[in-house]
């Protein structure tokens, strides 16, 4: 196993255990609003501190991009850890048990290792570039689909980007006619992992941040998924718009986005 993946797993488990334990004293969870429909709790910050100190004790010179703390500069500019200490904060605040710790390591702009840990189910999704994806050490692969007939698609409503709501609803309506069902779970990291593990057949979302998807997208790709932006390119880390499925699934989802999306989201 890649030594950095080892540290990522250690950090994710430590943070995840802290998050799960904090639910036992729910009255001590303090929530503040960062922006429109965007929440942060003291537990997010505590989990992030646990992850950062675990990384720094092994790799003090690496850079870290963290959801709550922003960029933590390091001497080694080539390595970046991208962390989301609690992906699915709204679920966590509501006591809805679906959230995860997400950690990815990028080297010279390419994601090398990734792990996503769900402390409520004790499921650990991992990937290393070129070496496949695993769920609790067992190999996972995406099952190809021919089209959207019978497909279950994961997505999320653009609550933080309501200017795109009309466009999004048109896309959703077009897919609704074709696919079997939608899943809207509240964690982008787990949506991508669930795609990798065949629990859903495809995934699309707009307006994400790099830490929402950095780990999940490598896990999905290493499980055999194609991952693109809304224009069919690979600029999703910049645009924040992502589509993931097997090749024909991506083609079908992109077609609906192109036909129904406004020009502002076709990137």
UniProtKB/Swiss-Prot annotation:
One term under GO cellular component: cytoplasm
GO terms under biological process: inositol metabolic process; phosphatidylinositol phosphate biosynthetic process; ribosome biogenesis; signal transduction; transcription antitermination
Record carries keyword Chaperone: yes
Pfam families cross-referenced by the UniProt entry: Inositol_P (PF00459)
Keywords tagged on the record: Chaperone, Cytoplasm, Hydrolase, Magnesium, Metal-binding, Ribosome biogenesis, RNA-binding, Transcription, Transcription antitermination, Transcription regulation
Role of this protein: Part of the processive rRNA transcription and antitermination complex (rrnTAC). The complex forms an RNA-chaperone ring around the RNA exit tunnel of RNA polymerase (RNAP). It supports rapid transcription and antitermination of rRNA operons, cotranscriptional rRNA folding, and annealing of distal rRNA regions to allow correct ribosome biogenesis. This subunit may play a central role in organizing the structure.
Catalytic activity as recorded in UniProt: a myo-inositol phosphate + H2O = myo-inositol + phosphate
Residues annotated to bind substrate: 67, 86-89, 183, 212
Top EC class for this record: hydrolase
NCBIfam families: PRK10757.1 (NF008027)
Location in or out of the cell: Cytoplasm
Protein name as annotated: Nus factor SuhB
Entry superkingdom: Bacteria
Essential cofactor(s): Mg(2+)
A GO molecular-function descriptor: RNA binding
Binding site for Mg(2+): 67, 84, 86
Main location, first listed in the record: cytoplasm
Subunit structure, interactors included: Homodimer. The rRNA transcription and antitermination complex (rrnTAC) consists of RNA polymerase (RNAP), NusA, NusB, NusE (rpsJ), NusG, SubB, ribosomal protein S4, DNA and precursor rRNA; S4 is more flexible than other subunits.
EC number: 3.1.3.25
Segments traversing the membrane: none
